[in-house]
């Protein structure tokens, strides 16, 4: 366990394993992406860190944290987010990197990739890249409104940055910027993601992740992405089956020269 200090003194937890070209994963939990990261660390330097927006939300933090109140923001603090990402990379001894993630953290990785001058590639799974942000904006705004109406304003704050992120993302067209990334570009997903038999169907079935990615495979290909479909896996399985997923991701990264 290691701690990086942001420019304003905020403490950020991170873990770095392996040597080689770097992959940086934002994570919601200290355990998130640990198994995948360990599998990838045979060839890469894998850095996982918790962005300040998730600190203390899903698990308690003793070492990380600091003064931070997202409730007062009326626009997404993109400069702070990128500076934090770079502070972690510096602490981990990383220069340029491929930014990576799965599901919600894939969204954050994809949002940051075009604006970080050190992110040269993107490796994301379980998220419909280039499919627009309307569904996810509605998800965040609906969750926030429900909590406010239930008298849980303190919990509603947890969705404040999410709604600001998707509002800003909806005003951007990142297609050209993503195509211009010089490093690896990979999207992977389970063939059953958000289908009726998916274990996440009752929560985000409307996202139709597998169908959305398939329908944009040609567009992703034109932007330089390799699209990997993990046969028979749902949203959970396309991350949890490390022995199936990791070799395919390594092959795609190596094919792209990483």
Predicted regions and their residues:
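Catalytic active-site module of serine/aspartate enzymes centered on a nucleophile-bearing elbow/loop
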Residues: 221-258
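Active-site nucleophile elbow and catalytic-triad environment of alpha/beta-hydrolase enzymes
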Residues: 161-177, 210-215
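Conserved loop-alpha-helix segment in the C-terminal half of the alpha/beta-hydrolase fold
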Residues: 195-232
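Conserved acidic catalytic loop of the alpha/beta-hydrolase fold
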Residues: 79-97
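Conserved alpha/beta-hydrolase
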Residues: 38-66
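Conserved hydrolase catalytic core segment
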Residues: 95-130
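Short beta-strand/loop motif that positions the catalytic acidic residue
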Residues: 181, 187-189
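Short beta-strand element of the alpha/beta-hydrolase
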Residues: 20-28
């Amino acid at each position: 366990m290691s701690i990086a200090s942001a420019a304003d003194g905020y403490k950020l937890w991170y873990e770095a394993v392996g040597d080689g070209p770097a992959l940086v994963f934002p994570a919601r939990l200290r355990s998130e992406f640990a198994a995948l990261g360990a599998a990838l660390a045979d060839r890469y330097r894998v850095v996982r860190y918790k962005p300040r927006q998730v600190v203390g939300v899903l698990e308690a933090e003793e070492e990380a944290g600091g003064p931070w109140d997202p409730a007062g923001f009326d626009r997404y603090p993109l400069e702070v987010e990128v500076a934090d990402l770079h502070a972690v990379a510096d602490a981990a001894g990383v220069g340029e990197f491929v930014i990576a993630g799965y599901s919600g953290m894939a969204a954050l990785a994809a949002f940051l990739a075009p604006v970080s001058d050190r992110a040269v590639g993107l490796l994301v799974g379980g998220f419909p890249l280039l499919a627009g942000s309307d569904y996810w904006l509605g998800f965040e705004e609906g969750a926030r409104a429900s909590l406010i109406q239930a008298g849980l304003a303190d919990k509603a704050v947890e969705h404040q940055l999410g709604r600001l992120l998707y509002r800003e993302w909806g005003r951007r067209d990142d297609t050209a910027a993503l195509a211009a990334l010089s490093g690896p570009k990979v999207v992977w997903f389970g063939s059953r993601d958000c289908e009726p038999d998916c274990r996440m169907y009752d929560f985000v079935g409307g996202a139709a992740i597998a169908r959305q990615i398939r329908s944009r495979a040609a567009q992703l290909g034109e932007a330089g992405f390799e699209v990997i479909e993990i046969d028979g896996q749902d949203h959970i399985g396309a991350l949890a089956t490390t022995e199936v997923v990791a070799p395919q991701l390594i092959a795609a990264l190596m094919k792209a020269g990483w």
